[in-house]
Amino acid sequence: MKGMILFISCLLLIGIVVECKEGYLMDHEGCKLSCFIRPSGYCGSECKIKKGSSGYCAWPACYCYGLPNWVKVWDRATNKCGKK
C-alpha cells in the first residue's frame, strides 16, 4: 500500500514538472523577441525575468524553457507579427 502511494505521488510530481512550457518570447507587437545584436546572456536574463528556468539565443530569437503557463510565447497559428 505504501508503495502504491509513493508511486502515485511520483506521478503527480512528474505531472507538475511537465506542465512548464517552452517557446520563443514575444515582444509588445507579438513578434519573436530578437537577440540578433544583443550581448551574450541576454536571452537567459529575459527568460529569468519571465520566471523561466533557462533560455538561449536560437538565432535570431530568444527561446525559453520552464516558463509558467501565464507567459505568452510565439505561436505560428496565432502569429500577429507585422499584421494590423
UniProtKB/Swiss-Prot annotation:
Residues 21-82 form the LCN-type CS-alpha/beta domain. It comes from the Eukaryota. GO terms for biological process: defense response. This is Toxin Tb1. Has the structural arrangement of an alpha-helix connected to antiparallel beta-sheets by disulfide bonds (CS-alpha/beta). Pfam families: Toxin_3. The modification Cysteine amide is found at residue 81. GO terms for cellular component: extracellular region. Keywords: Amidation, Disulfide bond, Ion channel impairing toxin, Neurotoxin, Secreted, Signal, Toxin, Voltage-gated sodium channel impairing toxin. One of its GO terms (molecular function) is sodium channel inhibitor activity. Belongs to the long (4 C-C) scorpion toxin superfamily. Sodium channel inhibitor family. Beta subfamily. Beta toxins bind voltage-independently at site-4 of sodium channels (Nav) and shift the voltage of activation toward more negative potentials thereby affecting sodium channel activation and promoting spontaneous and repetitive firing. Is lethal to mice. It comes from Tityus bahiensis. It is found in: Secreted.
